Each structure stands twice: as structure tokens, then as C-alpha cells.
Amino acid sequence: MKQPVIIAAKRIAFGKYGGRLKHLEPESLLEPLFNHFTDQYPKVMSLLDDVILGNTVGNGGNLARKSLLEAGLDFKIPGITIDRQCGSGLEAVIQACRMVQSGAGTIYIAGGVESTSRAPWKIKRPQSVYESEFPQFFERAPFAREGEDPSMIEAAENVAKKYHISRNEQDDFAYRSHQLASKNMNNGNISQEILPFKVKGECFNQDESIKPQLTLKTLGRLKPLLNEGTVTVGNSCMKNDGAVLLIVMEENRARQLGFTEGIKFVNSATVGVQPQYLGVGPVPAVNQLLARERLTINDINAVELNEAFSSQVIASQQQLNIPLNKLNCWGGAIATGHPYGASGAALVTRLFYMKHQFRTVATMGIGGGIGNAALFERWYGN
């Protein structure tokens, strides 16, 4: 098999739902990233085999294709959009790597985009053309069959109850996420990932959801989202707008084009779990991935596990025995945000910039009861 390597990765700063990016369609969120890669790597961009993007709540119509055309890329580049719900961005990266492995191509752009602020309203179609009732709006897409399809909040509560995760534990983890994200934004670690761009004439270069002044006392005052529950808006991620792009390339082609550093794709795993406990999807996914490579969690230097809810991250950490000092060391989605279709690609982007970590894992729990995970190693091409 051919060896895929990631030689470039960038994201925009993530906006809050209804925040500074609320007026921008997904294509506009991607455009500065496409332009950046075109400016920085014109030869690479002229040789692209495909663009593979994750997207979950967009307008449909193959957003990857439309976005690359809007950005002025060659019409000969096809484009494909992937929907594995919030695992879509990670799946896009995995699929690009698999395409390189198989020899189907040598250079791909992978990533994801989401605008929760611009997500279209969806209406149930009437059974009869003569139906006169008011239209029924879908609050969200169904993830599983009726009776086994909890809301995200219900699923997070299910995990908290099953694995005995207390309210205090969840609040503590959320506080940790904001503190680490704030620290690593200020020291320049997270800033490496972000491509600043102008929004209504002003530079946008910091994630809107990070709360550096957040306290445990403030978190403790928040009411549970469900009666007698433990999940709150404070120990959950926000809805966000954002975009991420990475360049995936065959190793020898990367050397030919002068690239000498990045991360190489080793393997991946995707596993189904009970939809009621979707948040612990990372557990079987990571276990399967490690078993395939004959590794243990002790062989992994850093793990990026998407923070949809504190409860599911804590449960997954405990079940996988991940040392806390290896988990989401720069903070996670509870602080920086969760633009669904882009989040998995953002995890890989973070690993790309953790240059002192050799062997790393990105993993996510996914709506409908799925976990996916990917293993990477630091790559030096010289």
C-alpha cells in the first residue's frame, strides 16, 4: 500500500451560533482556507485529485464541489461531501488517506465545514397534497429508529447514569477545557492552527466560545437541561460555525514536492454502539484500532477526543484508561466549539501541530451510535 501523509492543515477560528460568522454560508467559511492553500502551495493545488469534505446540516447539493468552484479552483477537480454526522470531518480525512493508500490518487484536500447559524429549516412533507395543517418543522435529523433515538442531551445523561459520572466531575472537566484552551490560545499553540481572516472589516482569529474567566462556581449555578439531570449548557459543547482543510498526499509525492514534515496516517477503525449511549463510541473504536496495530493506550502520546459533553469524554477516558495528561491537552470542543462536520478534521489539525508528540489518536462519538478513530505518527520526509 501507498503511505498517506498530511503535510498542511489549517482552520478558521470557530464562531458561536448566531455569532460573528452568522451571516456566512459554508462556502464562504471555506473560501479563505482554499485561498490560503492556493497562495502557499500553488503547485500542489494544481495537482489535486479530489476534495473530500464533511458536512452535516448544510443545504446539500454536494457542498464540497460547490465550495471549490466558489473558491476558484479548477473545474476538473470533482469534490465529494461526506455525512457521518459529527464524525464527518474525521471520516473525510480517513477517506482521503484510504484513497492514497489504494493508489487511486496522490493529492487530496480533506476537511469539513459547518454553519449552524445558516443551517436550513427542514419541514416534514405532507402525506396529502390537500393537507391543510400547519407545516411541521424538524428540530433535528433522526439518528436511529424510533424509541432508540435519544436527543444528544438525553444520550449524554444516559452515559452519565450508566457510568456514574457526577455533576461535579462534569463541571470540573468543562472548567479544565476552558482553562487549557485559554492558556494554549494565549501561548500560541492554538493560534498555529488558525488562519485569521477579515469578517466585516475586522480580523477574526480567536474561537468565540472560549471563556477564560469561567469559574467552577459559575458552572455550579447552571440548571440541568433535563429534570433531575446533571448535563448543563456549561458542561456541554456549544453549536458553532467553522471550517477546516488539510492536504493529504502520497509520501513519495510529498518528498518530490519538497515537503519534509507532517503526520502520517497509520490506520483507522469505525464501530457501531447502542444509539442510546452514542457518546462512548470512541471506546470500541479506539480499542479496535489499537488491537489492529498491536498497541496499547500506553503507546499513544496524545489523544484528541471530541468534547460534545463532559459525561461522554469522562466515560470514554475511564473505559480506555487514557491518562488525563494525554487527553485534549490544549482543551477541547466544550471550550473551542463543535461545528459538527468540521470537528473531526479539527482534531487531526490539532495533532498536526503537536509536533513533540510521536504517536497520536483522534476519535469521536457520533449520533446514531457510532465511534470512529484514526491513528497517526509524526513524519519526517528527509
UniProtKB/Swiss-Prot annotation:
EC category: transferase
UniProt xrefs under InterPro entries: Thiolase, Thiolase-like, Thiolase-like_sf_Thiolase, Thiolase_C, Thiolase_CS, Thiolase_N
Record keywords: Acyltransferase, Transferase
PROSITE patterns: THIOLASE_2
Active site: C86 (acyl-thioester intermediate), H338 (proton acceptor)
Keyword S-adenosyl-L-methionine: no
EC number: 2.3.1.-
GO molecular function: acetyl-CoA C-acyltransferase activity
BP GO annotations: fatty acid beta-oxidation; phenylacetate catabolic process
Pfam families given in the database record: Thiolase_C, Thiolase_N
Cystine connections: none
GO CC annotation: cytoplasm
Family affiliation: Belongs to the thiolase-like superfamily. Thiolase family.
PANTHER family documented for this protein: 3-KETOACYL-COA THIOLASE, PEROXISOMAL (PTHR43853), ACETYL-COA C-ACETYLTRANSFERASE YHFS-RELATED (PTHR43853:SF3)
Name this protein carries in UniProt: Putative acetyl-CoA C-acetyltransferase VraB
Chain's gene name: vraB
